[in-house]
Regions:
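Glycine- and other small-residue-rich loops at beta-strand/loop junctions that grip anionic moieties
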Residues: 2, 70, 74, 129
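Short acidic (Asp/Glu) and glycine-rich catalytic loops that position anionic groups and cofactors
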Residues: 22-27, 59-65, 115-123
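Hard-cation-handling environments
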Residues: 29, 35-111
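Feature captures C-terminal
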Residues: 7, 79-201
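Active-site-adjacent helix-turn-beta-strand microarchitecture at beta-sheet edges
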Residues: 1-55, 148-156, 160-163, 182
Length: 201
């Protein structure tokens, strides 16, 4: 359970007369550094990694601040990703899927290919560049926000808010759909509903 399987979920059931009379649930922390690694599994992992080890350990950069993907809206590694999408794709705005995973890096840590891959390892790895009007951008963001914040749990799709680069906005999660986002700005100017923007994702 939890991020990177840091816990075991433990549920104790009190069963009486064929029915659950009571239950208790708790998270049991796993202190991986105190558990001896399984030799067979260690060997298997090393064998599988060996052909890719040099590439995975290639250092791309060194962190200046803590890099993470943990927030519901944005993390510092998310910012690196959307900034890169804007720069590489020549976009005005970038969207990146909202996730809370990957290894957090502390200031001074190397950013290796492996660390980058565990931040971006998803099933739809291609990046795109599309043209979207300001109106469409707001509609997309409103739709995603509704998947998260709809008051009816049957309409909530889970996940996190899409990560956004280049665009600033305010959000009121309790507002109705179509009214959650406001003050959308690109480079300090209001997003123009009628203008077409280049959007990387």
């Amino acid at each position: 359970s939890g991020s990177n399987a840091k816990f075991l979920s433990v549920m104790d059931l009190d069963v009486r007369d064929g029915r659950v009379a009571d239950y208790q649930y708790r998270l049991l922390p796993i202190f991986a550094n105190l558990l001896p690694p399984d030799p067979q599994m260690t060997s298997l992992i090393e064998t599988v990694r060996e052909p890719f080890k040099q590439q995975l350990e290639t250092e791309l950069a060194t962190t200046e601040t803590t890099l993470y993907r943990r927030g519901n809206f944005m993390g510092s590694f998310d910012q690196v990703i959307v900034d890169a999408l804007i720069e590489v794709r020549g976009a005005d705005i970038a969207f990146s899927p909202g996730f809370r995973w990957g290894t957090s890096l502390l200031p001074g840590d190397p950013i290796t290919v492996e660390r980058l891959m565990d931040q971006t390892g998803i099933t739809y790895p291609k990046s795109t560049l599309n043209e979207m009007t300001g109106e469409m951008i707001k509609l997309v963001l409103e739709d995603i926000a509704d998947n998260l914040f709809n008051p009816d749990p049957y309409y909530q799709m889970g996940g996190d808010m899409v990560r956004v680069g280049g665009l600033r906005y305010a959000i009121d999660p309790g507002a109705p759909i179509g009214e959650r986002l406001s003050d959308l700005e690109l480079n300090g100017k209001p997003l123009d509903p009628g203008r077409t923007y280049k959007v990387a994702g």
